[in-house]
Amino acid sequence: MTEARESAGPQALRAPGTPCWVSLMAHRLTATEEFYGELFGWEFRPGPQQLGPYVRALLDGREVAGMGQLPPENRLPIAWTPYLGSDDVDRTAEAVRLCGGTVAVGPLDAAEAGRLAIAADPSGAVFGIWQAPAHLAPAITGVPGTPAWNELITFETESVAKFYASVFGYETEPVVSAGFDYVTLCVDGRPVAGVHGVGHGLHRDQGPYWATYFEVADTAETLRQVTGLGGRIVRPAHDSPHGRVATVADPEGAVFSVVQDPH
């Protein structure tokens, strides 16, 4: 999980299909900045305003994520959205439509940040597509406070993994295990994201969604911070092959996971 991004160089982080950015749309942008600033040590500066107020989060002066403000009348779920890299957003958006997905926003230009679109797969899970300009440095990864992994939580993996493979050219590696429905999405042999089929374990009122994992130095301390800052624990800390993991929600309800690198 964390090692997949730590071992990737700048060019690999830009390869088509690779998660290259995460963005959160919230109603109370200032309060959201305060929460994540305290939790991860992020600072903020203005970003592209094409879709409304938007800031870029920085860690040690390098970009790590983005946050935008939803209009008060917009009742969309508050959620972290991963952006998958593309060398031609318009072509990728057309592939999304041809393969049964939908494109809700764009493609559109985002000033110096490049070109983007926001789409959904056939099951309804929302993701972004980003064509970054060559001069733009990739987001920082591999240290606490940065995205470590992205995972699609859905009903079953077979059909949805085919969709993403068709659109982005992923190689797919199913996990062979009774009762565990999981597919790893790879680019040039490198794991970049996962698809986890949970069947009826998925809340019907939520639907399939992309989950974002952030690396932390100490999972237990992070959970204490989350609750102290007004967030809540969704799934308590537990050991995994990739480190100690927990799932939490920020004060507006955006769910994300944190993982402590075991190395």
Summary of predicted features, one role per range:
Residues 1-14, 18-27, 55-57, 72-95, 99-148, 173-190, 197-202, ...:
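Vicinal oxygen chelate
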Residues 2-3, 9-16, 20-62, 98, ...:
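Core segments of cupin and vicinal oxygen chelate
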Residues 29-31, 64, 74, 89-91, ...:
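Generic "edge-of-domain/loop-turn" microfeature
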Residues 32-34, 67, 77, 92-94, ...:
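Short acidic, gly/pro-rich beta-turn/loop elements at beta-sheet edges
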Residues 41, 62-65, 84-86, 103, ...:
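Short, low-complexity, polar/charged sequence segments that are solvent-exposed and flexible
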Residues 48-141:
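Active-site-adjacent scaffolding segments
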Residues 58, 68, 130, 151, ...:
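Residues in well-ordered beta-strands of folded domains
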